[in-house]
C-alpha cells in the first residue's frame, strides 16, 4: 500500500479527499483517528451531481462536527470545485496538488 502524506485543512480532525478525473471531481471527508483515518462520507461527484450540496447535507447529519469545521471543509470543497470547473480539469493532477497542498488527492482515472 502506498504511503500517503496527509496534509491538514487546518482541521486536525478531518481530511478532505479528492478524486481528480477528466469529466468529474469527487469529494469525500475522512476523520483522523489516532495515526490513521476513517471514512466519514462517501465520495460525491461534481458535476454529475451537486457534490457540494450533498457534502453539506451529509456533514450536517453528523451533529458532533462543529459548525466551524463544517464551514472550513465546505469552503475548501468550494475552492476545489471552482478550480476544477474553471481551469483544473484541463490541467495535470500535479498542478492541482501543488495548488492545494492541504488537500489529499487519492487518485485519478
From Swiss-Prot:
UniProt GO MF annotations: structural constituent of ribosome
One Pfam family, short name: PSRP-3_Ycf65
Classification via InterPro entries: PSRP-3/Ycf65_sf (IPR038447), Ribosomal_PSRP3/Ycf65 (IPR006924)
Any single GO BP term: translation
TM segment ranges: none
Domain of life assignment: Bacteria
Alphabetical keyword list: Ribonucleoprotein, Ribosomal protein
Cellular component terms per the entry's GO annotation: ribonucleoprotein complex; ribosome
Stated family: Belongs to the chloroplast-specific ribosomal protein cS23 family.
Function of the protein: Probably a ribosomal protein or a ribosome-associated protein.
Subunit composition and interactions: Part of the 30S ribosomal subunit.
The name this protein goes by in its record: Probable small ribosomal subunit protein cS23
Protein's organism: Cyanothece sp. (strain PCC 7425 / ATCC 29141)
Amino acid at each position: 500500500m502506498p504511503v500517503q502524506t496527509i496534509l491538514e485543512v487546518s482541521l486536525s480532525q478531518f481530511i478532505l479527499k479528492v478524486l481528480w478525473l477528466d469529466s468529474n471531481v469527487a469529494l469525500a471527508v475522512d476523520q483522523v483517528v489516532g495515526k490513521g483515518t476513517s471514512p466519514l462520507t462517501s465520495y460525491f461527484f461534481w458535476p454529475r451531481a451537486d457534490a457540494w450540496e450533498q457534502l453539506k447535507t451529509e456533514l450536517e447529519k453528523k451533529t458532533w462536527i462543529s459548525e466551524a469545521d463544517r464551514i472550513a471543509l465546505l469552503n475548501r470543497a468550494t475552492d476545489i470545485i471552482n478550480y476544477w470547473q474553471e481551469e483544473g480539469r484541463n490541467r495535470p493532477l500535479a498542478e492541482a496538488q501543488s495548488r492545494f497542498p492541504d488537500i489529499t488527492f487519492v487518485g485519478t482515472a
